[in-house]
């Protein structure tokens, strides 16, 4: 039987990946043990650099994973043990729109200034009121922060806000130094950022490395490391090589084909762990786009064999899904998790019914090097779509250029992206599909979905709120403004001198990484 084009591509991709990376350091059986690096310095290799030190004006998980070591939240949430105090000592839900907080005393910023409730007010009201900031949509529910004393304050929301604590424990809510920024200005802050975290800024060589040093005045436990270096290494093979030669202690996004090689090298190991990240395609649904036809979107979905990509290209490092809200998140619809649809013959039939019997062209943009096997994945999808008559004009982009176009909502019919969820709540996963938030991106407009999402945003009844999100996910799965591929597992390379368990939310709290 004739093998499909994408099947041949998949076989070739697996063979080539299995042959790559071995020339620099020899075969898996013959690797030399890695050299131990400085015991007081931790080096982590990311695939991308930080995008900004403005914690309100980015929405990139890999950047947040660095920032959590420089800035503190009011509270933390790992998705397993619930909320824990960080800068806040205690909190109380006074009524549906009012939360009271008490700060820990004696906390200092890296420049020696004391943390007070004025800093909290400055931070949260900035992100809540400035609609030009990328994280504004996650905090515009805040009406006011009322300072009651140096260490006491209230947060007043515009409407009931059931997910407020989730928001205050994630990206965008790290507390900023009001006096320092107002005195020196934002330009100075962005060059010399100041937080309250266990590590403080030392040096940044853009697109190369960011170096942090221990904050000896930290209010919590003393930092475990004298220095932490985050290196930006986009190439998979280079990250692996640096891990094997001792140039880095931790390397993210290890290709599945390199796992055996790493595990056969003394002194290092590869660890596979689940994440919150769901890889997906976002499609334009407006009438002016070819993907505005629901039959076309369904055909695209049915033409993609997600399970084959997970099994072969990712070697099992993922779980197919028809929702972005994965188990462990408030509002998850587990009936849609672990499921995928694949029926290329029906896809052809749907395209014929939609008036595209002779096929059509569409634009697809994707990052190259940001996610595990992102380039190879979209190339396979391009081949799969060609099998049903869809010609894809594929644009592969460096992450910084892709991210800029993403912020500008400048993509064509489709783009490929992966979203994490450090809120552990369905609201973060689904808010982009309200009519207002979808405008200019997917242009999705389903009044029933919109009503469900807006109602859930304000519903203080936890059970009813979860049901609203679950129903919305069922409708979204049928409408397909987003086509979900798989929940991605992380494969992390680790020097065996370390104790380190990768987190579900992909954060690098470096003081949880310790020497054995």
Please tell me what each predicted stretch does:
Residues 45-94, 125, 194, 507:
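N-terminal lobe/hinge region of extracytoplasmic solute-binding protein
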Residues 78-82, 169-223, 227:
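Gly/Pro-rich hinge or "lid" segments in bacterial periplasmic/extracellular proteins
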Residues 92, 137-179:
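Surface-exposed binding/hinge segments that line
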Residues 117-123, 150-154, 197-198, 225-227, ...:
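Alpha-helical secondary-structure segments
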Residues 216-261:
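Ligand-site clamp/hinge motif
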Residues 319-353, 371-375:
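Structural transition elements
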Residues 393-402, 428-496:
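Extracytoplasmic/peripheral linker and loop segments enriched in polar/acidic and small residues
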Residues 492-516:
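Long beta-strand-rich cores associated with HINT superfamily self-processing modules
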């Amino acid at each position: 039987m004739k093998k499909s084009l994408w099947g041949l591509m998949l076989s070739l991709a697996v063979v080539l990946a299995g042959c790559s990376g071995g020339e620099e350091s020899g075969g898996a059986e013959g690797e030399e043990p890695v050299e131990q690096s400085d015991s007081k310095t931790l080096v982590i290799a990311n695939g991308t650099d930080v995008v900004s030190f403005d914690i309100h004006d980015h929405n990139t998980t890999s950047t947040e994973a660095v920032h959590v070591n420089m800035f503190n939240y009011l509270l933390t949430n790992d998705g397993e043990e619930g909320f824990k105090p960080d800068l806040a000592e205690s909190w109380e839900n006074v009524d549906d729109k009012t939360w009271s907080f008490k700060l820990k005393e004696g906390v200092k910023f890296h420049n020696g200034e004391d943390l007070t409730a004025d800093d909290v007010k400055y931070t949260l009201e900035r992100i809540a009121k400035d609609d030009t900031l990328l994280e504004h949509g996650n905090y515009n529910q805040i009406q006011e922060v009322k300072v009651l004393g140096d260490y006491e304050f209230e947060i007043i929301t515009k409407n009931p806000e059931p997910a407020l604590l989730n928001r205050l424990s994630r990206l965008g809510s790290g507390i900023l130094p009001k006096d320092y920024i107002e005195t020196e200005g934002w330009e100075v802050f962005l060059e010399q950022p100041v937080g309250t975290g266990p590590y403080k800024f030392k040096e940044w060589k853009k697109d190369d490395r960011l170096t942090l040093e221990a904050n000896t005045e930290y209010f919590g436990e003393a930092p475990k490391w004298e220095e932490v270096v985050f290196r930006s290494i986009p190439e998979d093979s280079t990250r692996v090589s640096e891990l094997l030669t001792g140039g880095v202690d931790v390397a993210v996004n290890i290709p599945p084909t390199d796992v055996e090689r790493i595990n056969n090298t003394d002194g290092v190991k590869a660890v596979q762990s689940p994440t919150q990240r769901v890889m997906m395609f976002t499609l334009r649904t407006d009438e002016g786009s070819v993907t505005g036809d629901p039959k076309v979107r369904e055909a695209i979905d049915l033409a993609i064999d997600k399970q084959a990509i997970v099994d072969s290209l990712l070697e099992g490092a993922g779980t197919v899904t028809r929702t972005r809200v994965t188990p462990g998140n408030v509002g998850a619809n587990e009936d849609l998790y672990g499921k995928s649809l694949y029926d290329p013959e029906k896809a052809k039939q749907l395209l014929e019914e939609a008036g595209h019997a002779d096929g059509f062209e569409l634009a697809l943009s994707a990052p190259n090097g940001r996610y595990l096997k992102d380039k190879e994945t979209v190339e396979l999808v391009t081949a799969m779509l060609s099998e049903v008559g869809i010609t894809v004009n594929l644009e592969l982009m460096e992450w910084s250029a892709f991210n800029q176009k993403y912020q500008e909502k400048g993509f064509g019919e489709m783009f490929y992206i992966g979203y994490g969820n450090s809120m552990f709540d369905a609201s973060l996963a689904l808010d982009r599909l309200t009519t207002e938030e979808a405008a200019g991106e997917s242009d999705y407009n389903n009044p029933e979905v919109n009503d469900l999402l807006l109602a859930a945003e304000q519903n203080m009844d936890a059970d009813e709120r979860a049901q609203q999100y679950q129903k919305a996910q069922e409708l979204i799965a049928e409408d397909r403004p987003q086509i979900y591929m798989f929940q991605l597992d992380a494969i992390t390379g680790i020097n065996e001198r370390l104790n380190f368990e990768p987190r579900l939310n992909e954060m690098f709290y470096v003081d949880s990484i310790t020497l054995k």
